[in-house]
Amino acid sequence: MLAKNRLPGSGHTTPSPPASPRRSPRYRHGRSKAAAGSRFPTVQPSRTLAHRLSWILLSVLLRRQGIFLFAPLIYISCMLLYMGTVSFDVVPIIQRRPPPGSVYKSPQVYAKLRPEMDADNSTADAITTIWKHSYKGGEWKPYVNKSTGDLPESNGYIYVEANGGLNQQRTSICNAVAVAGYLNATLVIPNFHYHSIWRDPSKFGDIYDEEFFVSTLSNDVRVVDTIPEYLMERFDHNMTNVYNFRVKAWSPIQYYRDSILPKLLEEKIIRISPFANRLSFDAPQAVQRLRCLANYEALKFSKTILTLGETLVKRMKEQSANHGAKYVSVHLRFEEDMVAFSCCIFDGGNQEKQDMIAARERGWKGKFTKPGRVIRPGAIRQNGKCPLTPLEVGLMLRGMGFNKSTYIFLASGEIYDANRTMAPLLEMFPNLQTKEMLASEEELAPYKNFSSRMAAIDYTVCLHSEVFVTTQGGNFPHFLMGHRRYMFGGHSKTIRPDKRKLAILFDNPNIGWRSFKRQMLNMRSHSDSKGFELKRPNDSIYTFPCPDCMSRRNKTTTPESRPPPAT
């Protein structure tokens, strides 16, 4: 059998090879026209380097399937390398929204409320309708009686140094009277300690009527202005040589009997310095009576201060004649030192920041920059510890129903950045007055550089107002509230705003006037209901005179006389 010749020969027919499979259309363009008639296929163009590497990698992976076990590790390594090349500076920072009440937004609230506030044509005037709370059981009356008869022989002399401002010194005076009476000692007129903050060198007689003070207490406590010569000779006429007791704050009266009286009997003179808040509020009734007698009856401002104060009261009543001779007094604490001490942030920008840093260093020298001390202005504001600004006081009073024509007496020191911060308050209450506006320069000249004497004038005008508004804690409003209760049948006639609630309301620029006014009227009503309160064991008798210093008008009460002599 002849083998078939695979090579073509001329004139011979041979079986043709099987037909080649049709080439995919995607590869048809690879055959050139020159080779179209050729029987031999043309050589394919070489693959690219990327194709070769891909085929090599794929073939390795298919032959070595165990490599897939390392795929997660390879993936993580690649991701770490990638992340190392990315800059995270461009990642957006999500800032948390400040908690409600932590930011000062009162100017925005004022701008939002002012059109509606000015358009409010309510006819009711708060000053004539504010006090509606009825006295449960009837009104109260003062019942501090003076003792009769001669005093027993004195156990010695007590000399105290009263530090602080006007009303902190007042606390020391009244407590010294109580301690001297309890120990059957003779009280030396208290010495006022000069303080760099208050910068007032005034003596007792410059502020109070010394003669009236001594005579009012004459049947209960001996009071002298000097120590006998024979005693001072023992100490070389130097009070620093006298034995000094450093008494703990809020010490009970028994401490004075057990620890101080023996030394007093031995030395016949002792010194207590400092003496601010050195006697607890919880004391026997006989001791409380002496406190009441000293504070509400014996302490009267000097004739010059009292005369000017009463003159300003008369002028305020004359100006407010169309309001029934009634005016509102506001104790505003927005002086530079108060703003600095609070550590709150307002709207004064960088200038305010620099001013406050300088004021803190000037007044407290490093107290606020100690290592580890953290100051959180937002939390301070939320807790109601920031002093109210003049703008906030104006918004609050307008919301409480005091209209634009209300007469306001502003008791304050030098307001921080007054030209800017006082402008909104004057817009809301154009009939606002201060002692500097009511009195002439000649009338104020003797008191100008004495902060305690100026505070005494403010105290007098506030005492006789129909409404007293306190905007910040402190001795001034606490004493004034107690004194007003003593004068007005047990009711303080005082507005004490809820500053925590105010912080939240003033942090809402979207609040409407009706909603804001409703909240303020509720706050006013709450102050009315709290106007009359009985003293609790740890309350100050200088703020809550009932029932230790007062009795019901429909009851006859004979208070306890002087305490028995301590021996």
UniProtKB/Swiss-Prot annotation:
GO terms for cellular component: Golgi apparatus; Golgi membrane. Glycans are attached at residues 121, 145, 184, 238, 403, 419, 449, 538, 554. It is a single-pass type II membrane protein. Substrate binds at residues 331-333. Pfam families: O-FucT (PF10250). Ubiquitous. It is found in: Golgi apparatus membrane. Belongs to the glycosyltransferase GT106 family. This is Protein ESMERALDA 1.
